[in-house]
From Swiss-Prot:
Record-level GO cellular component terms: extracellular region
E.C. numbers: 4.6.1.-
Phylogenetic lineage: Eukaryota, Metazoa, Ecdysozoa, Arthropoda, Chelicerata
Secreted recorded as keyword: yes
Disulfide bridge map: 44-50, 46-189
Keyword annotations from UniProtKB, A to Z: Cytolysis, Dermonecrotic toxin, Disulfide bond, Hemolysis, Lipid degradation, Lipid metabolism, Lyase, Magnesium, Metal-binding, Secreted, Toxin
The name this protein goes by in its record: Dermonecrotic toxin SdSicTox-betaIIB1bxiv
Location in the cell: Secreted
Cofactors that this protein relies on: Mg(2+)
Catalytic activity line of the entry: an N-(acyl)-sphingosylphosphocholine = an N-(acyl)-sphingosyl-1,3-cyclic phosphate + choline; an N-(acyl)-sphingosylphosphoethanolamine = an N-(acyl)-sphingosyl-1,3-cyclic phosphate + ethanolamine; a 1-acyl-sn-glycero-3-phosphocholine = a 1-acyl-sn-glycero-2,3-cyclic phosphate + choline; a 1-acyl-sn-glycero-3-phosphoethanolamine = a 1-acyl-sn-glycero-2,3-cyclic phosphate + ethanolamine
Location of the active site: 4, 40
Protein role: Dermonecrotic toxins cleave the phosphodiester linkage between the phosphate and headgroup of certain phospholipids (sphingolipid and lysolipid substrates), forming an alcohol (often choline) and a cyclic phosphate. This toxin acts on sphingomyelin (SM). It may also act on ceramide phosphoethanolamine (CPE), lysophosphatidylcholine (LPC) and lysophosphatidylethanolamine (LPE), but not on lysophosphatidylserine (LPS), and lysophosphatidylglycerol (LPG). It acts by transphosphatidylation, releasing exclusively cyclic phosphate products as second products.
UniProt similarity note: Belongs to the arthropod phospholipase D family. Class II subfamily.
SUPFAM superfamilies the UniProt entry points to: PLC-like phosphodiesterases
Length: 273
């Protein structure tokens, strides 16, 4: 269960208390591709305040504590951090610079270049395939800085509901054949059909297809849509209301089929139910 738009530091506890075991937050860049703040802005989901924010590096410092064993701030349940990268707000020419910057800030403030024991998995949410240079830069930077091992903790996810074959082609260009999630969804203000979601699930379940390991639906607020997504076999849901998802998961139909992921689970492996 991914808590959606958790952009203020005080919201982290709020969403975890509602039952989320993953959080998504928005990264806003300046015109040069430097990550500045966690901030969504207007418009955003119905019934939500769009303007909450924090300085990105301070947010990382806080979330490091929340995901570090034996830290007083530890919240054991939080296993995944989804960085919603607002690259569509800057020139595609700055995507590489943005990738370098986010990698360095994670190295300095989250992983602390090997001195941190923070253990959450990181999902890089890229809005459009045209911004794929962000991924190249991120990986180049880890390599150049001597921390390629952190690649094991990082997954890739394109969130713009683009053609799945087009996404596969870009992953092929980047040489990425693992640790790939696929999102499908729309703002909670609107309804969305299931055609593309079903296609993504079908590809996930195709033997030998290495470009989708997990599929999740966003942003779900109605229990009927949560049930529909679970029946289709999604790996996760993003919601403004994690407590509603918890209630649905406890229903007889789903209680034996789904559970919340923990650190004993590998987020990059296809689930074989």
């Amino acid at each position: 269960i991914m808590g959606h738009m958790v952009n203020a530091i005080e919201q982290v506890d709020e969403f975890l208390n509602l039952g989320a075991n993953a959080i998504e937050f928005d990264i806003d860049f300046d015109k040069d591709g430097i990550a500045q703040i966690t901030h969504h802005g207007i418009p955003c989901d119905c019934g939500r305040k769009c303007t909450k924010k924090a300085i990105f590096t301070e947010y990382l410092d806080n979330i490091r504590q929340v995901t570090t064993p034996d830290d007083p701030e530890l919240r054991e349940q939080l296993v995944l951090l989804a960085l919603d990268l607002k690259l569509q707000r800057i020139s595609s020419a700055k995507a590489y610079r943005a990738g370098e910057d986010v990698a360095k800030k994670l190295l300095d403030h989250y992983w602390q270049r090997g001195n941190s024991r923070a253990r959450a998995y990181i999902l890089l949410n890229i809005p459009l395939v045209e911004d794929y240079e962000f991924i190249r830069a991120f990986k180049d930077t880890l390599k150049n800085e001597g921390y390629e091992s952190y690649n094991d903790k990082v997954g890739i996810n394109f969130t713009g509901n683009e053609d799945l074959d087009k996404i596969r082609d870009v992953l092929e260009i980047l040489g990425i054949h693992k640790q790939v999630w696929q999102a499908d969804g729309i703002t909670s203000c609107f309804a969305r059909g299931t055609e593309r979601l079903k296609e993504a699930l079908e590809k996930r379940d195709t033997p030998g297809y290495n470009y989708i390991n997990k599929v999740y639906a966003w942003t779900l607020v109605r229990k009927s849509i949560m049930r529909r997504s679970l029946r289709l076999g999604v790996d996760g849901v993003m919601s403004n209301n994690p407590d509603r998802v918890i209630k649905v998961l406890k229903e007889k139909e789903f209680a034996d089929k789904f559970r919340l992921a923990t650190y004993n689970d590998n987020p990059w492996e296809k689930f074989r139910g």
